[in-house]
């Protein structure tokens, strides 16, 4: 039987020498990678303006991506003769984003065209019609909501009969009018609906609550690639 080979331990002859793996490496690109702003922001005092917070505090992760979006909007999109398109996806108008954000941007001239899901433009009409849309909770029991004639969009609560079905009924009456009895694109369809939204706002003593109404007043076309995901298309 062969004897096992003797294992030799490795010893450093000069213990004062630094091991190779501890030697300072040559890092030719290190300076480039470390050329970004040092992360050492000053503490917030409560006196900062929003632009200062975005530029000086939003330094990393999703806050940095938000800062990039803000700077892109400020430095590029607001330049003269720049065409700005807006896309809306997800339940934005039921959450009030139409009233609070989209309408002011349209009124300020910062939107040249919109592409939205059909559902966003449909739910936008509830606001022009002054139908109730309320804050709820994602924890609500959907079965109990159904028994109480309510519908939940995550944590937004909308009455079924008094908002959804009522909007559907009005839409059915509108879409049989002569002006709709022809082939048309989605921009023309929503332009015509926007005219009705303007009138509903006026009758309800409201202003600047509907994206379709604001788009109609500003001449901003509203397209959708998915008209069938709401009553408008169905």
Show the residue positions of the predicted features:
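Metallocofactor- and cofactor-centric catalytic cores in central/energy metabolism, strongly enriched
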Residues: 2-165, 169, 174-182, 195-234
């Amino acid at each position: 039987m062969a004897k096992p080979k003797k294992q030799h331990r490795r010893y450093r002859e000069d213990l004062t020498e630094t091991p190779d793996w501890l030697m300072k490496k040559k890092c030719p690109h290190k300076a480039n990678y470390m050329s970004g702003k040092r992360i050492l922001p000053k503490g917030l005092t409560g006196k900062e303006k929003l632009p200062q917070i975005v530029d000086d505090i939003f330094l990393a992760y999703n806050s940095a991506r938000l800062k990039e979006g803000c700077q892109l909007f400020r430095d590029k999109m607001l330049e003269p003769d720049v065409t700005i398109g807006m896309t809306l996806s997800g339940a934005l108008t039921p959450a009030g984003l139409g009233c609070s954000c989209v309408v002011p941007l349209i009124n300020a001239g910062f939107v040249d065209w919109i592409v939205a899901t059909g559902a966003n433009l449909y739910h936008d009409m509830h606001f022009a019609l002054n139908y109730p849309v309320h804050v709820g909770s994602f924890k609500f029991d959907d079965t109990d909501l159904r028994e109480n004639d309510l519908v939940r969009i995550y944590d937004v609560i909308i009455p079924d009969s008094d908002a959804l079905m009522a909007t559907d009924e009005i839409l059915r009456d509108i879409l049989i009018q002569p002006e709709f009895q022809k082939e048309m694109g989605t921009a023309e369809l929503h332009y015509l609906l926007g005219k009705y939204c303007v009138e509903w706002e006026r009758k309800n003593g409201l202003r600047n609550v509907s994206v379709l109404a604001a788009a109609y007043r500003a001449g901003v076309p509203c397209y959708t690639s998915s008209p069938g995901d709401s009553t408008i298309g169905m």
